Amino acid sequence: MRIRKYDFNYSRRAFLDKMATGAMAAGVLGPLWPLIARAGDITKAYPEELLSIEAYTKGKIKTGDLITADNVEFVKDLLDPVAYVHVSQMGRQIRIVKTTTDATRLFPKKYLDATLRNQGKAQLDADGNVVTTEGKPWIGGNPFPDPRDGLQAFSNLTLSWGRHDNSFYAVRDWDIGPDGDLQYEYDFCWAEQNTTALVGDNGPYMPGHEDKLRFQSVWFTYPNDSKGTSFLNTWYYDQRKFPDLQGYLPAFKRVRRFPTNQRFEPLVPGITLFLSDAWAAGDPMLTWGNYKVIGRQPMLGAVSENWMGPGTNYERPVHGGAKGKTFMETAMELVPETIVIEAEPTGYPRAPV
C-alpha cells in the first residue's frame, strides 16, 4: 500500500492560504525559482495532482484525450469562462498533452538567463514604473519572478511581450460570423523591437531610445483593398504615457496620426484583433489601474505541441461552430500554477469593459 504524502486537496489549501496571507512566491511544495535556477526542473515544486491531468481529474481525463462537450465538466475549473462556453455549447475541442516540467523550454535562453542574473535588481519607482535599484530603465528578463502584487506580475508581461528583443510574425486572419461563415480574411505582418530591457549582446538599451520601451508595427498585404494599410506604435518607457500611433491608409495616400487612446477599435473592417489585445498586455500598464490578484490556481494553457509545420502552410485544421470552421485545433496542458489578475481601464473613458 502506498501512502500519499500530500492528499488530493493539498494544493487547493495551499493556494487558498497564499491568497489569504498575500504570499506571491510561485511553488507549492517549495519555492519555484531556485529550482529553475539549479536545473530548470519544476517537479519538486508541485505535488503530482498539479503535474498530471490524470491525477488531477482522478483518471477521468488522460494525456492524449480530447476535451469535448461530453467531458468538459471534469476540467471546467481549469478553463476560463469563455473557453468553457466554446467547448460546452459551440463544439470546440481541445487536445490534452503532457505538462511541460522543464522550464528552460518556456523561455528563450537569453531571456531566462537575464531573469536569473537580474533577480532582486528591480523595483517600482514612485510613479509605478519598473526601474533598477539605481533608478535606470529595466535591464532584461522578468523584473519580478516572484511578484508581490498584481502590478508587479503584470509588469513581467508588459516589458517584454514575446521574450525576444525583436520578433516578426506572418499572420493569416479569418473572421468568422455568428452564422459560421467567413466574413473577412486578412494577411498581415506584425513586428516588435524592444529598445530597453534588451537581453542581447549589445547591452540592455538601444542607444538614443532609452526613453522608449518598444516599436511595434503591423502592415496588411491582403486583400487588395487593404494592402498597404500599416500602423506604427511607439511605446514610451513611462507607462503612464499613451503610445504614439501613426498609420498609412492607401486610399488617402498619406500618413496620419491616430488617437492612441482608442485602442479597443478594429484596425481594419471586421477584424477582431485590437492593439489592446497584444500578449494580453497591449496597453501601457499604468493606463490601467486597480490591479488585484483574485486567484491562484492550476489552469489549462496552450504551452506546447501546437506547431503545425509547413505541410499545411502552417495553418491549423478547424472545427466547431455553425459551419465547422470557427475554432482552430489547439493542444493544452495542465499548468500547475497561474496568477489570476483583475484590472480596470482607468485611462480609457471609451473602453468597452
Functional labels for PLM-detected ranges:
Residues 22-35, 230-238, 352-353:
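Surface-exposed flexible segments
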Residues 1-40:
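N-terminal secretory signal peptides
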Residues 226-228, 255, 352:
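Short, mixed charged/polar active-site loops
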Residues 112, 119-120, 189-209, 217, ...:
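Extended beta-strand-rich segments in extracellular/periplasmic secretory proteins, especially
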Residues 232, 237-311:
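Acidic, serine/threonine- and glycine-rich low-complexity intrinsically disordered segments
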Residues 123, 175, 245-248, 343, ...:
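Hydrophobic beta-strand positions
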Residues 41-242:
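Solvent-exposed N-terminal domain segments of exported/luminal and surface proteins
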Residues 220-224, 249, 253, 262, ...:
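Short, flexible loop/turn elements at secondary-structure junctions
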